[in-house]
Amino acid sequence: MNPILKVNRVCKAYQQGNHRVEVLEHLSMSADAGEKIAILGPSGCGKSTLLSLLAGLDKPDVGTVEIDGQDLAKMSEDARTRTRSERLGIVFQQYHLMRNLTAIENVGLPLEILGKPDYADRARMALKAVGLSHRVAHFPSEMSGGECQRVAIARALVARPSVVLADEPSGNLDQKTGEEVMELLFSLCDEHNTTLILVTHNEELTKRCDRALILKNGALQKVKG
C-alpha cells in the first residue's frame, strides 16, 4: 500500500541578513491512511516550516512533498488550492476563522471552493458533528475560543480530507477545553480513517499517536512506533 503522504529528502533554508539558515536538511517521512503521527521538538526547530511544506503553503528548496502520489510543488497555484480544500485539512493553534462570516459559512468555504452545491448542508452536518448545531449563524466574535476551535476542526474535516495537519490546536485553550477539543479531533479522524499529523508538546497526546517523531538538527528521528 502506498503512503497517503510522502516527504522525500526535503531541504528548506531561509536568509537571515547575510546568513543562510538551514531549517530542514534532507528530511524524509511518510504516513499511511488513518495513521496518527506526533511531531515533537523545541520552539524554532522547524516544525511550523514542515507543516507549511506539507500543506503546500511553501515549497521545498530540494526534495518533494507528495499527497496521494502527487507532488505539491509541481501543481499550479489553483491545483494546490483545490488540493488543500479537498485532500488536506488544517487546524492551527490560532483558529484563523473569517471574522465576517458565520460558523456555517466558515465551515462551508472548502466545499464552496470545490464548487459543491450541497456545501451548506454538509457544513451544517459538520457543525453538528462537533456539537455546534446551535451556533450555525453565529460569528467568531460571538463564540468562545473553544467553540471557534471546534468550528476550525469542522472546517478541516468537512471535505473528508485524506490528511489533517494540526499545529498545537489546543495550545491557546484552558486544559479542560483543550482536552475536549483534542478528544473530538481524534474521534473524528478515527471515524473517517483520516491521517493526522500533530505538532504537540503534550505527552498524553503523543501516547495516543501511532508514532512520534522528534525534529532535531533539521531531520526527523523516531522516538515511538
Language-model regions: role of each:
Residues 4-216:
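ABC family nucleotide-binding domain
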Residues 217-223:
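Conserved switch/coupling elements of ABC/ABC-like ATPase nucleotide-binding domains
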Residues 1:
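Exposed loop/turn and edge beta-strand positions of beta-sandwich/beta-sheet ligand-binding modules
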Residues 114, 223-225:
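Short hydrophobic/aromatic patches at helix-to-coil boundaries
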